[in-house]
Each structure stands twice: as C-alpha cells, then as structure tokens.
C-alpha cells in the first residue's frame, strides 16, 4: 500500500508544478502578439492596436477580414484613405479606420513573421444606427372613449433596436417589439403597436415612440403624434361682481369648455317659462338688480357633441353700506383739512404762551423808545419795589 500512495503523491506534486504561476511564466511566449476586440458605430473611427514584447527583429503586420494587408510596419499596403497609420515601432503597430461601414465588420489579423509566424485576432463589431421612428395609424380626431391604435417602425439598427411608447410622462405598454432582417442581411427593422382608450384629458396629448439602441449612447431618437379628442361640453356660471347687491349691474357669465367649444348658450330661470332674452354672447345681463331677480338660473351650453346645463342661485342682497368713492374722497379731504387746522391751533397756543412770557420786556423797550422815558423808569422801579417791599411804595427819580 506504500508504493501506490507514494506514486499518487508524486503525480499531485507534478500537477501543482505545471499549473503554478511560476510554471505558467516559464511557458509564456514573448514573441506572441496581442490585440483587443473593438466595437464602433457606423460612420465612426476605430483604432486597431497590436503589441508584442519580443519582436525578434521582425515587423508587425495588419490585414483585413479578406486577408488583404493593410500595413506592414510603417508601409501602407492597401490604397484606402480611410486607413491611417497611428503608431509604428518594433513593439507596436496601431492603425485607424475612419468612416467605418457595416462591410468593415469582421476579424482583423495582426501577424509577426517569426519562426513560426505568430498571429492575433481582433474582432471589429460595427453598430448600425437606427433611423428615426415613423408613427402610423392616426387618421383623424377621435371621440371620447374611442380606442386608438398606433404603429411605430424603425429600420437600420444592428443589433436590433427596442421600441418604447409613452403619453406625455406616462409610459404606455405596447406590444413586444417585432424584428425583421433588412435586405442587406446586416441590419434590422423593428416595429411595435400600442392600443389605448382615449379620454377628454388626452385631447392635445402627444404619443411618443422612442427607439433605444447602444449606438445612440443615451441620445434621444423619437417621434411624436399629437392626437385630438372630441368630447361633450361642460359649463360653469361666474357672477360679476361676485357678491351682487340690489341696484347694481350684474353679469352672469356662462363659461363653456369642450372640443369643439360650445357655440350656443340658452338661459332659463326656474319658474319662468320663456327663455331669458337679455343676453350678451354667453352672459346674462341684469342692468339694475332687484329683489325679484333672486332665484335659480340655468345655462345650457351646446355643441355638436352634446349639451350641458349649469345652475347658479342668485340671492340679491340689500344695497351696500359701504360709502361711495366720492364720499371716501370727501372724507380724506376733510381729514387733511382737520389736521391742518389742528396744527394751526397748536402753533397759535405756542405763540400766545411766548408773547405772555416776554410781555414785560416788550413794554420796557417800547417805553424807553418814547418821550416819557424817565417816567417809565420810575414806574418800573416802583413796580419792582412793590413786589419786594410789601405795602410801602416809594418813588425814585433817575
């Protein structure tokens, strides 16, 4: 049993040595070139890069899927102005192909002519750009609650694109995208349909079909179809002024909405047999409101889609106690006048107080300026003495 166990252990050691990273490095071929696969949008530019670690004094070469040599080192081999040299060194050969077409798709080969010849493949994938989608199926305006079916189609995509629907910001769930190969055998035509019931809110809405494809790189490519929906009218009555009072002029506006817009309006008052005649377009006019005008009024708005009747209850209030504008102006003017009079009174009071305080000085100066100045001085002294000396009054002549 010892010999078989030893043999098994030896085999495991050999297997580990062969698959160890060190063993892999020992078997690496430094003269083997390497490349990478590339994806390019039709009409774009692709760069093919080939590199080698040990060139063994040999040049790198690029050839197309038809095995036509494009570049050998820095030397152009195929006369195609779309193909240009990017880098040429002993360790790298890079070329670019501009204005790439679907026919350029395939495997490109990088070769190095050592012994033996070594090659590396680069798969170039060309994306076909989908055309702007086309919406069909909408012929004329729809009636409310009708069912609409729209079709969308886009061709030229590779790989096949995907179509989505939306109405405004709302996503519509259409049928799965149908795929059909184009006659060129390389691109595809995709189509989808959507069916939905229309409402009055859909009037004027845009139904959008968008194509999603990696070649667009997030750019929007869509088509919209605006739809028109016919629906029965609605109406509401708006009073002007909002709170009518007795003696005022009142207009009751009947505001109709619909598609088409109502063109005929008929006014009635409950309890009154004949239709009301005092109208202006869609408004009912009351030149001078009376209490007898109170009641419930109806407005019937009519279009070729039907009719709608709105009601309004009118309660005529007593005349407004609010003063007229002229009375308001008079009150303002009266207030200004009263304020001015008040200021004048204040000024007169201050002026009188000032004159009383300075009356003695004024009389003294006036007396000194007259011919009886000595007598005036005597009088002043007597007056001062009378205040300080009690009942004894003496005269002094200056």
Curated annotation (Swiss-Prot):
Annotated Gene3D superfamilies: Immunoglobulins (2.60.40.10)
UniProt disease annotation: Charcot-Marie-Tooth disease, axonal, type 2FF: A dominant axonal form of Charcot-Marie-Tooth disease, a disorder of the peripheral nervous system, characterized by progressive weakness and atrophy, initially of the peroneal muscles and later of the distal muscles of the arms. Charcot-Marie-Tooth disease is classified in two main groups on the basis of electrophysiologic properties and histopathology: primary peripheral demyelinating neuropathies (designated CMT1 when they are dominantly inherited) and primary peripheral axonal neuropathies (CMT2).
Gene: CADM3
Sequence ranges on the Extracellular membrane side: 25-330
Gene Ontology molecular function: any one: protein homodimerization activity
Classification lineage: Eukaryota, Metazoa, Chordata, Craniata, Vertebrata
Site (Not glycosylated): 25
Residues modified by glycosylation: 290
Protein name (Swiss-Prot/TrEMBL): Cell adhesion molecule 3
